[in-house]
């Protein structure tokens, strides 16, 4: 009898496995589908024009076959302007919006015409959301390019978190735990307000396809 219960438990686990560890078999790309990419480019690799990250990003942008490309934190110096514009020139329609600091830029590159744009701003510096209407064939599709508050953990916080996980018995672990929980909780509250603000606006658009 024990083996029978074990068998049922194994079958039940196997049925649920795909939900937690999905294994996707490659399938042909459906005809007429839209490929979308979105990245936080973090100022295109930092301040130096010769960094490996910057050159790699330029190459990636040049070779991207996405129909719609969304980027966050798209700041750049005047010295980079021509190179970056050349890298994204294969997208016919392009738009960048800045609110507050120049580092908070959002960029949309599209194969489809941009009909209009709505910008939602938030109290926290550098966080904005741009909602676009694109003409895709005979349809109108809404594309959301958003930059919400993150979990607010800096490099020191991440280091403290790793040490807390590896050595939970250390005296400072409890204090670090309480401090990080408080910090992430505050960031989460700000992010929730931003998400609610976006959703309130999207509800006014009615029944239209939305890419987020």
Predicted regions, residues:
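Acidic/histidine-rich helix-loop elements
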Residues: 38-54, 152-187
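Active site of divalent-metal-dependent phosphoester/diester hydrolases
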Residues: 93-108, 175-204
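Active-site beta-strand/loop signature of hydrolases that rely on acidic residues for catalysis
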Residues: 35-41, 53, 57-81, 142-147, ...
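Structured beta-strand-rich core segments of catalytic domains in phosphoester-bond hydrolases
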Residues: 5, 11-30, 49, 62, ...
């Amino acid at each position: 009898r024990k083996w029978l219960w074990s068998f049922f438990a194994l079958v039940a686990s196997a049925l649920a496995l795909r939900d937690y560890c999905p294994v996707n078999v490659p399938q042909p790309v459906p005809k007429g589908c839209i490929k979308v990419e979105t990245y936080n480019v973090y100022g295109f690799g930092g301040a130096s024009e010769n960094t490996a990250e910057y050159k790699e990003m330029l190459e990636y942008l040049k070779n991207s076959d996405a129909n719609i490309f969304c980027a966050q934190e798209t700041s750049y110096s005047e010295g980079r302007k021509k190179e970056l514009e050349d890298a994204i020139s294969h997208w016919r329609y392009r738009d960048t919006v800045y609110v507050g600091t120049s580092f908070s830029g959002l960029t949309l590159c599209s194969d489809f015409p941009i009909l209009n744009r709505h910008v939602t701003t938030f109290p926290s510096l550098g966080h904005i959301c741009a909602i676009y209407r694109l003409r895709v064939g005979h349809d109108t599709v809404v594309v959301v390019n958003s930059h919400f508050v993150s979990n607010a953990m800096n490099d020191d916080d991440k280091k403290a978190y790793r040490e807390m996980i590896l050595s939970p018995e250390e005296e400072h672990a409890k204090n670090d735990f309480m401090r990080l929980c408080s910090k992430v909780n505050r960031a989460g509250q700000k992010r929730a307000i931003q998400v609610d603000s976006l959703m309130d606006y999207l509800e006014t658009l009615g029944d239209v396809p939305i890419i987020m």
